[in-house]
From Swiss-Prot:
Species in which this protein is naturally found: Bacillus subtilis (strain 168)
pH dependence: Optimum pH is 6.0-8.0.
Biological role: Catalyzes the exo-lytic cleavage of beta-1,4-N-acetylmuramate (beta-1,4-MurNAc) from the non-reducing ends of peptidoglycan chains. Specifically hydrolyzes the natural, peptidoglycan-derived disaccharide MurNAc-GlcNAc and the artificial substrate para-nitrophenyl beta-N-acetylmuramic acid (pNP-MurNAc). Requires a MurNAc entity at the non-reducing end, and cannot cleave GlcNAc-MurNAc. Probably plays a role in cell wall turnover and recycling.
Name used for this protein in its record: Peptidoglycan beta-N-acetylmuramidase NamZ
Catalytic activity: Hydrolysis of terminal, non-reducing N-acetylmuramic residues
């Protein structure tokens, strides 16, 4: 079932309007490509019509909040005569997805709907009572990517807190984990390293849907919101995003493809170093490199490790923004050749340790402490600096990972 080489967006978009009357071969081919899975926004209005009638809705969303026909959640709610969309809330990158990572997004009036849009990234990460004064139900419809340091899940957590504090029900419109729901990897975040790229003690790769995470956050971390998860239909844990046949809309500017979501928990750690993680290229998180790296040397060394489900190709690139902007970088491109066997965190740690060992005079962990925040602790960086093997590092967190796995099972919906 799994593909050995990723299918790109064009393969995902081959579905359209299907007419029941047609029986032509072309129609059959189109039907075969029809999405298997219905997300929360698809099941919301049919399943919760009575509960929503006459309610004022606040919606936290971004461009990836679409139904199976690519219609925006904003438009779906705004056009429904039985409810009133009264407020929009934008996470990092904004409701329309037009801001780069780290850019603050201001509040404004949405041009299409006339609904006020409030930013939840920057100084204000939690909806205020003033923002919620005309809201009866607060909804969340954003595509997560299954990695702890992707900030949308903490936008959700803060919004759940605000809903609890203001006596407002909170609804999560569930969506697939693009990486599937069976694999968990990586160290558990230690509380002293909590930040907006890691708020709670969960593993780096959690293997949960956004709705399942909401349930876990709500109970395990005592948010206690009046939470409803609007479930998907037909999603199975073994499915990656391609298996759902849903259209993939990039959830953030540097997450352009399904392939990006798979490599992100590996090379996202590189953001905490002086190595480019490929921002400013057309292959963010797939391309990694720096001016001082020798591409062929790195390619050969990494491939000699025989890491499962991944192959490295020597590559050079010039980032148009972010680290090493306008400077020729040399490194590798990652190709995930088997999604089921690929171990993202092991791969990421192996890449960082290999570059550290090959270029000790040039490689650096950033002085901002960002690597420790991404890793969720300080000891992984120390172990890499001290020459500890990747296997030893992984063994150091396996016990706590297994403990989390037991807790996680209580909140699995599918």
């Amino acid at each position: 079932m799994r593909k050995t080489i990723f299918a790109f967006l064009t393969g995902l978009m081959m579905f359209g309007t299907i007419t029941a009357a047609s029986a032509s071969p072309d129609s059959k081919n189109q039907t075969a490509k029809k999405p298997k899975v219905q997300t929360g926004i698809d099941t919301l209005l049919p399943d919760y019509k009575k509960q929503l009638k006459g309610k004022r809705i606040g919606l936290i969303t971004n461009p990836a909040g679409v139904n199976t026909s690519l219609k925006s959640s904003v438009d779906i709610l705004y056009e429904n005569p039985d409810i009133k969309l009264t407020a929009l809330f934008g996470p990092e990158h904004g409701v329309r997805g037009d801001a780069q990572a780290g850019d603050e997004v201001g509040s404004y009036i949405d041009e299409k709907t006339g609904v006020p849009v409030y930013s939840l990234y920057g100084k204000t990460k939690k909806p205020t009572p003033e923002m919620l004064k005309n809201v009866d139900i607060l909804m969340f419809d954003i595509q997560d990517v299954g990695t702890r340091f992707y900030t949308y899940i903490y936008t959700m957590a803060y919004a759940m807190e605000a809903a609890k504090e203001n006596g407002i029900p909170f609804m999560v419109l569930d969506r697939p984990n693009p990486q599937g729901g069976n694999h968990i990897e990586g160290p558990i975040l230690e509380p002293e390293y909590a930040s907006f790229v890691g708020l709670y003690p969960i593993p780096l790769k959690h293997g949960m849907t956004i709705g399942e995470l909401a349930s876990l956050f709500n109970k395990e971390f005592s948010i206690d919101a009046d939470l409803t998860v609007v479930k998907m239909k037909h999603w199975k844990r073994k499915m990656d995003f391609d298996d759902t046949r849903l259209p993939f809309v990039l959830p953030s500017p540097n997450m352009p493809t399904v392939e990006s979501t798979f490599v992100y928990p590996a090379t996202g750690l590189i953001e905490g170093t002086n190595i480019s993680e490929g921002r400013g290229t057309t292959k963010p998180f797939e391309l990694i490199g720096a001016p001082f790296i020798k591409s062929t040397e790195l390619e050969e060394t990494l491939n000699s490790l025989h890491l499962p489900g991944v192959t490295f190709r020597a590559a050079s690139f010039t980032p148009t923004f972010s680290k090493h902007q306008g400077t020729l970088c040399h490194g590798v491109q990652l190709y995930v050749t088997d999604r089921d066997k690929f171990e993202a965190v092991k791969t990421g740690l192996s890449v960082i340790k290999t570059i550290h060992d090959l270029y000790p005079e040039d490689f650096e962990f950033l002085s901002t402490g960002s690597f420790d925040k991404l890793a969720g602790n300080g000891w992984i960086r120390t172990k890499i600096e001290n020459g500890t093997s990747v296997e030893n590092i992984i063994n150091s967190y396996e016990k706590t990972l297994q403990q989390f796995s037991k807790t996680r099972k209580k909140y699995l919906i599918y």
